[in-house]
Amino acid sequence: MSTNLQTQAFAGNPIRSKTPKSTDPFSPTSALESLKTRLLDNTLHCQPQKHHSSLSSSSSSSPDFKVLPFRKGRPLTYSGPGETAPVWHLGWISLGDCKIFLANSGIELKEEALVYLGSRSADDVVYWAIDVSDGDSLASEFGSKQLCFVELRTVMVATDWADQRAMADLAIAGHARALLEWHNVSRFCGHCGEKTIPKEAGKLKQCSNASCKKRIYPRVDPVVIMLVIDRENDRVLLSRQSRFVPRMWSCIAGFIEPGESLEEAVRRETWEETGIEVGEVVYHTSQPWPVGPNSMPCQLMVGFYAYAKSFEINVDKEELEGT
C-alpha cells in the first residue's frame, strides 16, 4: 500500500543534533555554567523588547541565550501581522527580558526552572525552556507585548505542514513541553521518596538523598497506532471516542503492555476495541507525541498498517463510541 505520509508532527527538531562534548561551550554542562554567570550579572536588567517580531533575533543583552516560556504546558507564542488566520510562532525571549518579566510578576528566576533544549553553534545561540506556571500575572504581562500562551495541540493544528521552518518550531516546542512536564511529575525519587534535583541542565534528575542518588531519565511511553485495512485496500477501520468533536474519526491506538511486542500490541488493541482479528502487521513510521496527558508527556507513537483477517465489528463501548 502506497501512502504519501512523509511528514511527522513533532519530529525533525533542528536543535537536537548530536550532543556536543562536555568541553564544548554549547554542551549542556558548559552552557549551564555560562548561564549561571549571566544570571548573576546585573547587566541583564535591560529594557524588554518592544516588538514581538524581533523576539526570534539575537538580543544585545544576552545574544547567546534564547528562552521559551511555558505556562501549564502551553508555549509562549505570537501571531504575525497581516495573517488572516492565526499562525502561531514561538515567542522566544532573551534571558534579560525573561528576568524582567519574572521580576515584574514577583517570581525569582531559578536555575532549576530552566531546561536545556539544544544549540546552533553557527548562530552562537543556546536554547532553553522555562516553566512559569506559578506566575499568575504573567499572562497579562506577556499580553501587553502581544504574546500569549497557546495549547500545543492548537499550535499543531494551525501549523502549515508544508512549511519546514514551522514544523521545526513545532518539534522544538514539543521537545520542550515533554521535558518540562516530565520534570513536573518527577519531583520525588521513586526508590526512597526524597526530592529530586535536575542534572546536566535538566536532561536528567537525581535523588537528593546522599545514600540513594538514583539517576532518573525522561520516561518514554510507547504507543501503537494502526490503520486497519483489508487486502484489497478498499476498506479501512476508523473509530471515534465520545470526547471527539463532531465528524472526527481516528485510527485505533493503544499503549504497549509489559512483555509485549509492537506487533502483538497492534493485534491485541484492535481485537479488544473492535473485535477485528489482525494478521500481518507492517511498520510505517513513528513520531513523538508530547500532547498526551501531563502524566505521560513523552509518548512515542509507532504507526503500522494492520491487515484484517475478520470483518465482523464488535465495538467496546467503554473505549469507543463507534467505528
Predicted segments — roles?
Residues S2-R165:
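N-terminal alpha-helical interaction blocks
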Residues I172-L180, G190-P198:
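Short, intrinsically disordered, charge-biased short linear motifs at domain edges
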Residues G193-K199, I229-D234, E273-E277:
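Secondary-structure boundary elements
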Residues A201-C251, Y283-H284, A306:
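N-terminal strand-loop-strand
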